[in-house]
């Protein structure tokens, strides 16, 4: 990114309408400067200050065997500031303060060898949710952002070519594979064959229980669910469920 309000990078894209998702594996990426961004992106327009949701990784040149983080960057308003990893955000705690969702390092590299990292970025309404995975099967939620965008937007691959402040013409590159873009979805309803859960198996006494549903590619999560505590079906006010992100929180005093 050129600065917080103006984008300047390489973007390969296509136009999509309404709900959509992009899934891909980042096979490899070069690192020519600190915090070079590589990943997938939804944009409302091709203007430099467009509203944006971008899922990717930030590499650190001095320690390029691993990623510093896999994170969800966003620009909520046209020509507003983008929440992006930079030199001043040098820890997960600082990223959290800046409102940047991230996950700890995945196994993108083993020494000099690339293992690759999978990305899944989903738009459902005005909610954009990012997931990352080592194998493309078991997904970790990176985070979600609510961004009001038009019905027709762009989706594609974003690579910050970047360049260190020297005379060398050395630019960043990236290789993607296993690319899938979906614009049509099948509702899962109660067909559990297309749903997986992640999160803790239990909660400590007196604390809320949290977990998450993830739908297979090309499927939408159900609009509503029922949860049992013991033999009883909980009333909806006893738990929260977000059909756009799959997040479930059961209140501690309703657990048995």
Regions found by a protein language model. Give the residues of each.
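Generic structural detector for well-ordered beta-strands
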Residues: 15, 146-148, 180, 202, ...
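Short, solvent-exposed loop/linker segments at the N-terminal edge
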Residues: 201-207
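Surface-exposed interfaces of beta-sheet-rich extracellular modules
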Residues: 208-246
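Small-residue (G/S/T/A) turn/hinge positions that recur once per unit in extracellular repeat modules
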Residues: 192-200
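Extracellular glycan-recognition regions
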Residues: 1-185
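A short, Gly/Thr-enriched small/hydrophobic beta-strand-prone motif that recurs across taxa
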Residues: 186-190
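Extracellular interaction modules
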Residues: 17, 171-175, 242-256
């Amino acid at each position: 990114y050129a600065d917080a309000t103006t984008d300047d990078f390489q973007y390969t894209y296509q136009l999509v309408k309404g709900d959509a998702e992009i899934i891909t594996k980042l096979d490899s990426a070069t690192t020519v400067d600190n915090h070079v961004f590589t990943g997938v992106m939804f944009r409302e327009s091709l203007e430099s200050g467009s509203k944006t949701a971008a899922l990717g990784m930030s590499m650190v040149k001095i320690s390029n065997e691993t990623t510093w983080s896999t994170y969800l960057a966003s620009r909520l308003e046209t020509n507003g500031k983008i929440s992006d990893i930079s030199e001043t955000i040098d820890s997960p705690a600082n990223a959290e303060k800046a409102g940047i969702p991230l996950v700890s390092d995945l196994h993108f590299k083993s020494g000099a060898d690339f293992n690759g990292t999978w990305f899944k970025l989903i738009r459902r309404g005005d909610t954009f949710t990012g997931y990352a995975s080592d194998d493309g099967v078991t997904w970790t939620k990176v985070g979600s952002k609510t961004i009001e965008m038009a019905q027709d937007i762009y989706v594609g691959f974003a690579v910050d070519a970047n360049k260190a402040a020297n005379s060398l013409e050395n630019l960043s590159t990236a290789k993607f594979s296993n690319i899938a873009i979906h614009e049509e979805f099948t509702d899962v309803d109660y067909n559990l064959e297309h749903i997986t859960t992640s999160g803790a198996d239990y909660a400590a006494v007196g604390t809320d229980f949290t977990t998450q549903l993830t739908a297979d590619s090309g499927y939408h999560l159900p609009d509503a669910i029922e949860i049992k505590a013991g033999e009883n079906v909980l009333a909806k006010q006893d738990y929260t469920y977000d059909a756009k992100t799959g997040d479930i929180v059961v209140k501690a005093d309703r657990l048995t």
